[in-house]
Structure formats: structure tokens, C-alpha cells
């Protein structure tokens, strides 16, 4: 019975914590949602530009290294 309790007790505790978390969460209103969506979009754009410029810098460097061999 002790082996069963060692498996069931963590699952029961996880379920209890999950229910507590869901009860505390709230649905964002339109203003909060648009703010989060805008910041996420800005993050995607910034990361895209960073990736583009890194690629733009390393393509000529790679051609110099590979082209010299």
C-alpha cells in the first residue's frame, strides 16, 4: 500500500495545485489582450530583423571562407 501512496500522493497534490491555479486565473479583457498581442508582434519583428542582419553579415564571410579553398 505504501508503493501505491507514493505514486498517488504526488498526482493528487499536482491535481490540487492545478485546480487552484485555474481558479486564480482570469480571462484578459480586450485592452490587456491587444497590449500583449502588440508586444508579442513587436518581439517577432525584432527577432526577425536580428536574424536577417546576422544572416546578411555572415553570408559574405562564409563565401570568403569557402571560396578561398
UniProtKB/Swiss-Prot annotation:
Bilayer topology: Single-pass membrane protein
* Localization annotation: Endoplasmic reticulum membrane
Give the Cytoplasmic membrane side ranges. Answer: 1-32
Q: Which residues lie on this side of the membrane: Extracellular?
A: 62-69
Q: Name the GO cellular-component terms.
A: Ssh1 translocon complex
Q: Which cysteines are joined by disulfide bonds?
A: none
Molecular function GO labels: protein transmembrane transporter activity
- Do you know which InterPro entries this protein is assigned to? Prot_translocase_SecE_dom_sf, Translocase_Sec61-g, Translocase_SecE/Sec61-g
**One of the GO biological process terms:** post-translational protein targeting to membrane, translocation
Question: Mind telling me which residue stretches traverse the membrane in this protein?
Answer: 33-61
PROSITE patterns documented for this protein: SECE_SEC61G
Transmembrane: is it a keyword of this entry? yes
The record's listing under Pfam families reads: SecE (PF00584)
**UniProt entry keywords in alphabetical sequence:** Endoplasmic reticulum, Membrane, Protein transport, Translocation, Transmembrane, Transmembrane helix, Transport
| Function as written in the Swiss-Prot or TrEMBL entry | Necessary for protein translocation in the endoplasmic reticulum.
Q: How does it assemble?
A: Heterotrimeric complex composed of SEC61-alpha, SEC61-beta and SEC61-gamma.
Give the UniProt family note: Belongs to the SecE/SEC61-gamma family.
Identify the PANTHER family for this entry: SEC61 GAMMA SUBUNIT (PTHR12309)
Instruction: Name it.
Output: Protein transport protein Sec61 subunit gamma
Q: Which organism is it from?
A: Oryza sativa subsp. japonica
Q: What is the lineage of its organism?
A: Eukaryota, Viridiplantae, Streptophyta, Embryophyta, Tracheophyta
